[in-house]
Curated annotation (Swiss-Prot):
The keyword Coiled coil applies. This is SH3 domain-containing protein 21. The gene is SH3D21. Residues 65-126 form the SH3 domain. Residues 1-60, 132-501, 536-605, 672-692 are annotated as: Disordered. Pfam families: SH3_2 (PF07653). It comes from Macaca fascicularis (Crab-eating macaque).
Length: 692
């Protein structure tokens, strides 16, 4: 603004100077030009001055191209004929500031012209000048403002676009170790990419493929840290292959993955899509966790990841996948269920994603741990896919797998199982935190995650309905828990205890001890108790046991599961009994050990999925809703009570104030009455005296 004003003055001066002072300045007065307004105030004065003193405007007149008005501060009496008389308050128009004597200006006041001392006047900002300057400033200001506004308006749009692009991508880019890289990929994919991952399996896979390598690298590092002995790293490689290729058949482990890919095709629904994503990612469940993880995995899952890292990157990733699913509640439940399902096998994923997550992690670990497990899972996955077609066949296959790999799976399951427990806890929090509904669904996941075994049982629980038949049939034998099964759980415990320590999954280790505790270990702690625990699970107790894994919400959720899971409970008792007895880890691990029993269960679950998701979720949701509603009701009651108390206090205060005011009014009235009476009495007396 200042610059523009400064520039305008010289321009005006130049124009005035260029114009002949006599004519041109007066005629045009600068009004024709937008910049001239500053000169317009006194266009005629300069010409008069020039005519009186000079033929052409001298250079020093440039400083005063137009008369400036100064206010007189002090009176001045002229001592010479050419001096100007000044009176305080008068306005002097300065015609020239350059005269023969320094400190003297030439000006005009009240129609007289002369010189006067410059220290007798104060230059108030001339009104005439100010008006043009303001106009100019307004003109220039709008020009500048639009420029400023334009970038502002454009910036918000850009920011919004960036946020829009990054926001969806972030939400869908499961915050994984490589969040930045994922964000970049997600940005490229844009919100569409995020929706693709959630909505359609193939696009989701593509995205996850791009991101999974990063996650896998992180997860592979985690696995290496957790236990080099674990095959997870090896498994990861196949998983990477799987992630790189939607059809993960390339590797034997990928074969299950490839089957899972078909499942994605089969499963267009969000849950199935998730399942597909999970299965695709679950070629090694860890892969599914990783693949979905990148897209879906939320930060909470990441939190679980540390545990998972300790246990197995894969586990954490599966959990992440679950978590990812959780972020999108609708798909989350399904995806979580699916994720868990994959643990048991792909079947579990689809049928019982909720339960599967834990199972998934455990199986994933097992897969990572042993190719056999992966093969079993592959077959299991195939069974799972087929399970929709025939759960019995899947169960048989699973049983055969379990029988074959019971020892190896037990060992491996122990390792994977331990990790699942930690993830479960974190997931449990995440699931519960994220949403009651998810909680209901996730609680099973959480329970499963909390304790691999628990998760297994949870998976089995999802299976329960399908398993109910098979498990019920197998329940007696399983509940009997042949010495072999019990021994295997014990062995599994030992292995888990050993592997878990390796995994450094203290949480799992804890669970292992819990195995004694079996987070549910409450009963699970001992396999001997496991049968009891399983029975409780079959009953509500088993649920509660699982609930411990999940937490309270998980218990409630598990209870619904158990309601459904009673079958699973039987199976769990049968399969999980040893596994749960082992502890959550044992269960997950046992499931892997009996991997397949759980897998069969999970396969059954595939059939159950529809039942489980509804009944199971409904039960969980009901339990969660009831507890949450109770809490809300209590909080509301408290709030109402507080409000009532506060209102009462306020009312009492108001009443007191009213009473005090009434009393004051009465007093004032009394005083007024008394005063009036007193005043009247003297008047009467005075009147009487006057009359006399």
């Amino acid at each position: 603004m200042v610059q523009s004003e400064l520039q305008l003055q010289p321009r005006a001066g130049g124009r005035a100077e260029a114009a002949s002072w006599g004519d041109r300045g007066n005629d045009k007065g600068g009004f024709g030009n937008p910049d001239m307004p500053s000169v317009s105030p006194g266009p005629q004065r300069p010409p008069k001055l020039s005519s009186l003193a000079y033929d052409s405007p001298p250079d020093y007149l440039q400083t005063v191209s137009h008369p400036e008005a100064y206010r007189v501060l002090f009176d001045y009496q002229p001592e010479a004929p050419d001096e100007l008389t000044l009176r305080r308050g008068d306005v002097v128009k300065v015609l020239s500031k350059t005269t023969e004597d320094k400190g003297w200006w030439e000006g005009e006041c009240q129609g007289r012209r002369g010189v006067f001392p410059d220290n007798f006047v104060l230059p108030p900002p001339p009104i005439k000048k100010l008006v043009p300057r303001k106009v100019v400033s307004r003109q220039s200001a709008p020009i500048k403002e639009p420029k400023k506004l334009m970038p502002k308006t454009s910036l918000p749009t850009v920011k919004k676009l960036a946020t829009a692009a990054t926001g969806p991508s972030k939400a869908k880019t499961s915050r994984t170790p490589s969040r930045d890289s994922q964000k970049l990929t997600s940005r490229d994919s844009g919100p569409n990419g995020g929706f693709q991952s959630g909505g359609s399996c193939p696009p989701g896979r593509k995205r996850s493929k791009t991101q999974t390598p990063q996650q896998r690298s992180v997860s592979s590092q985690e696995e290496e840290h957790s236990s080099p002995a674990k095959a997870p790293s090896v498994k990861r490689t196949p998983m990477l292959d799987k992630t790189t290729t939607p059809e993960r058949p390339p590797a034997p482990e990928n074969a299950p993955g490839s089957k899972k890919i078909p499942v994605p095709d089969k499963v267009p629904s969000p849950e199935k899509t998730l399942t597909l994503g999970d299965k695709a990612s679950i070629p090694g469940n860890s892969t599914s966790g990783k693949i979905p993880g990148p897209d879906i995995v939320p930060t909470p899952e990441r939190m679980v990841t540390p545990e998972d890292k300790a246990s197995i990157p894969e586990n954490s990733i599966p959990e992440e996948a679950l978590t990812v699913d959780k972020p999108s509640t609708p798909e989350r439940l399904s995806s979580v269920e699916e994720a868990s399902g994959p643990e048991v096998p792909p079947m579990d994923k689809v049928p019982d994603p909720k339960m599967a997550p834990l199972g998934d992690e455990a199986p994933t670990r097992e897969k990572v741990l042993t190719p056999e497990l992966s093969e079993e899972e592959v077959s299991t996955r195939d069974d799972t896919q087929f399970h929709h077609f025939s759960s019995e066949e899947a169960l048989q296959k699973v049983k055969s797998f379990v029988a074959k790999e019971a020892p190896s799976s037990q060992e491996k399951a122990h390792t994977p199982e331990a990790p699942p427990l930690q993830p479960p806890s974190s997931e449990k929090c995440l699931g519960e935190m994220k949403c009651p509904l998810v909680r209901g669904d996730s609680s099973p996941h959480q329970a499963e995650l909390k304790s691999g075994p628990a998760s297994r049982p949870a998976l089995e629980k999802p299976h329960p309905q399908a398993e109910a038949t098979t498990l019920l049939e197998e329940a007696p034998s399983k509940e009997e828990r042949t010495p072999e099964e019990e021994a295997s759980p014990n062995e599994e415990r030992l292995l888990r205890g050993e592997v878990l320590p390796k995994e450094g999954v203290a949480s799992k280790g804890e669970v292992l001890p819990k195995e004694g505790v079996a987070s549910k270990g409450e009963v699970l702690p001992k396999e001997g108790v496991a049968s009891k625990e399983v029975l409780p699970k079959g009953g509500v107790a088993s649920k509660e046991e699982v609930l411990p894994k999940e937490g309270v919400a998980s218990k409630e959720e598990m209870l619904p599961k158990e309601g459904v899971a009673s079958k699973e409970e039987v199976t769990l008792k049968e399969e999980v009994a040893p596994k749960e007895e082992v502890p959550p880890i044992d269960t997950a691990f046992a499931q892997k050990t009996h991997p397949i029993k759980p897998s069969p269960d999970s396969q059954e679950t595939l059939t159950l999925p529809s039942l489980l998701p509804q009944n199971y979720t409904e039960n969980k949701n009901e339990g969660v809703d009831v507890t949450s509603l109770r809490g809300e009701v209590e909080s509301l009651r408290r709030a109402l009570e507080l409000m009532g108390v506060q209102l009462e206090r306020k009312l009492t205060d108001i009443w007191e104030e009213l009473k005090s005011e009434k009393e004051q009014r009465q007093r004032l009235e009394v005083q007024v009455m008394q005063g009036t009476q007193k005043s009247q009495t003297p008047r009467i007396i005075h009147a009487q005296t006057q009359t006399y």
